[in-house]
Amino acid sequence: MIPKEQKEPVMAVPGDLAEPVPSLDLGKKLSVPQDLMIEELSLRNNRGSLLFQKRQRRVQKFTFELSESLQAILASSARGKVAGRAAQATVPNGLEEQNHHSETHVFQGSPGDPGITHLGAAGTGSVRSPSALAPGYAEPLKGVPPEKFNHTAIPKGYRCPWQEFTSYQDYSSGSRSHTPIPRDYRNFNKTPVPFGGPHVREAIFHAGTPFVPESFSGLELLRLRPNFNRVAQGWVRKLPESEEL
């Protein structure tokens, strides 16, 4: 059992650790690979970094990150354009004037959507939320006829384009089964020949001695086949047996 005197120093250690530890400013640590990569890509004297920066500018050109103030400016300019078009809708035509008015079609959203605001007759209204730009896509469209290209046309049969030409007399397949060969036709198909030409073998044999190939049967070929099997032979000479012995 540990005596009470030894427990007191041990309980005083957590109190010492709770005090603020003095810290030193040792500067920047070693750069990690990601920091080095970003630093190299920001240089102006490297061909790879220049290509990366050019690509970043091209990406930023087609990436629109509009702030709230810019969205309000665009919305006000859009309302001004709608009002201008409504004012220019009255066009004189000959002796009488025909009045044309522009209509702004706004899709009806869900009844509890606070982001949808309907435009008035003069085109005034607040900016709608991005979720209310196309409310028709939230549910299937109704009353819209199906598009024609969605139906695949399956042909009932196949009609060969050469059918009308093969019906003529010139294209009849029964009259000429093969192409006629002319008299001066030469066949250039190559066949294996011995070295020196095809007439070397004929020069070996004389004209008076016709060459007759020998007919070897299977058993004759097996008899003439050399045997390489070896049998152990002793020092005693093998003598043929005779009646005298």
UniProtKB/Swiss-Prot annotation:
Keywords: Cytoplasm, Phosphoprotein. Myozenins may serve as intracellular binding proteins involved in linking Z line proteins such as alpha-actinin, gamma-filamin, TCAP/telethonin, LDB3/ZASP and localizing calcineurin signaling to the sarcomere. Plays an important role in the modulation of calcineurin signaling. May play a role in myofibrillogenesis. The gene is Myoz3. Residues 50-67 are annotated as: Binding to ACTN2, PPP3CA and TCAP. It comes from the Eukaryota. Its main location: cytoplasm. Pfam families: Calsarcin (PF05556). The modification Phosphoserine is found at residue 31. Interacts with ACTN2, LDB3, FLNC, PPP3CA and TCAP. One of its GO terms (cellular component) is Z disc. Residues 67-108 are annotated as: Binding to FLNC. It is found in: Cytoplasm, Myofibril, Sarcomere, Z line. This is Myozenin-3. InterPro entries: MYOZ. It comes from Mus musculus. Belongs to the myozenin family. Residues 180-201 are annotated as: Binding to ACTN2. Expressed specifically in skeletal muscle and is enriched in fast-twitch muscle fibers. Not detected in heart.
